[in-house]
Amino acid sequence: MQALVNKIWYEGHPLRWLLLPFSVLFALITAIRRSLFRLGLKSQTALPVPVIVVGNITVGGSGKTPTVIYLIELLRQHGFNPGVISRGYGADIQGVKVVTAVDSAAAVGDEPAMIVARTSVPMVVGAKRVDTAKALLAEFAVDVIICDDGLQHYALGRDIELVVIDGKRGLGNRHLLPAGPLREGAWRLNQVDFVVVNGGPAQANQFEMQLSPSAVLPVNPKAEAVFNPTQPVVAMAGIGHPARFFETLTQQGIQLALSHGFDDHQAYDKHVLCELAASRPLMMTEKDAVKCRDFAQENWWYLAVDAKLSPQFDQQLLSRVRSVAAAKQGKSHGV
């Protein structure tokens, strides 16, 4: 099914024409919803600290999670104490939940589990972004909130919008759902504060980001094995665009005996993965690793990657955060 969807969205499959009437209906519904917020008929909750929303206008992976981790580290390096909120996609969360390092991906979602495992950032997950943001502020002394994937959740007031685009797949056929991959029209890119292009050329007023492999690490934190870079591996990826991960492995000189793409947010079974690997080294993404660490074998590995952005991006982002923070502090003191 996913293969057919990709052909429709990214390869010009003629079935897209049959879906266009539904895309028109989707456009109408989303336009009405935006208008309700713009006209004040639905309320937007403003928060006392800067809110950065990191999202995309397409369905599927684009590199949001590495971008969120980059922002956490950048803000910390410059004296801020950021916190993160997320939906916790794939997890059955009642109300809101504080994410801890011992939480499983099944309990909090794979992206939140990965973000906290990497950064130990204060993080709260839940279905309603406003509730998660309020819980984060009540529980932790954070001075910036990063919302992981909430661009279309307009009830949450935001000060900075950052959109991440897949530089290889772009906006696909540029149609709205379901005929294309767009959640909102391409015009939305002209309204956000920052557009980050992951792994592709950036246009004027956009910023290029590269995901740089940093290390091959064991999925099982107690494993004592040493990775052999000359031994072919079985590669797997349960992300929005598995082919990108397999290409990265090949570029790193890692030989692939077999590659297998799973659905995004796939829940894994130990026996299925053991059968897939067949005693060979198994290589996966960091996002997959947090879902497999409790039952990982000695020769299971993941490739850690770090986002790289330009100093110009850093300067503009920090300047914007400082400006918003100063304005909100002045407002709270009646200045």
From Swiss-Prot:
<keyword id="KW-0067">ATP-binding</keyword>
<keyword id="KW-0808">Transferase</keyword>
<keyword id="KW-0418">Kinase</keyword>
<dbReference type="GO" id="GO:0005886">
    <property type="term" value="C:plasma membrane"/>
</dbReference>
<keyword id="KW-0441">Lipid A biosynthesis</keyword>
<comment type="pathway">
    <text>Glycolipid biosynthesis; lipid IV(A) biosynthesis; lipid IV(A) from (3R)-3-hydroxytetradecanoyl-[acyl-carrier-protein] and UDP-N-acetyl-alpha-D-glucosamine: step 6/6.</text>
</comment>
<keyword id="KW-0444">Lipid biosynthesis</keyword>
<comment type="function">
    <text>Transfers the gamma-phosphate of ATP to the 4'-position of a tetraacyldisaccharide 1-phosphate intermediate (termed DS-1-P) to form tetraacyldisaccharide 1,4'-bis-phosphate (lipid IVA).</text>
</comment>
<dbReference type="GO" id="GO:0005524">
    <property type="term" value="F:ATP binding"/>
</dbReference>
<keyword id="KW-0443">Lipid metabolism</keyword>
<comment type="similarity">
    <text>Belongs to the LpxK family.</text>
</comment>
<dbReference type="GO" id="GO:0009029">
    <property type="term" value="F:tetraacyldisaccharide 4'-kinase activity"/>
</dbReference>
<dbReference type="InterPro" id="IPR027417">
    <property type="entry name" value="P-loop_NTPase"/>
</dbReference>
<dbReference type="InterPro" id="IPR003758">
    <property type="entry name" value="LpxK"/>
</dbReference>
<keyword id="KW-0547">Nucleotide-binding</keyword>
<protein>
    <recommendedName>
        <fullName>Tetraacyldisaccharide 4'-kinase</fullName>
        <ecNumber>2.7.1.130</ecNumber>
    </recommendedName>
</protein>
<dbReference type="Pfam" id="PF02606">
    <property type="entry name" value="LpxK"/>
</dbReference>
<dbReference type="GO" id="GO:0009245">
    <property type="term" value="P:lipid A biosynthetic process"/>
</dbReference>
<feature type="binding site">
    <location>
        <begin position="58"/>
        <end position="65"/>
    </location>
    <ligand>
        <name>ATP</name>
    </ligand>
</feature>
<dbReference type="GO" id="GO:0009244">
    <property type="term" value="P:lipopolysaccharide core region biosynthetic process"/>
</dbReference>
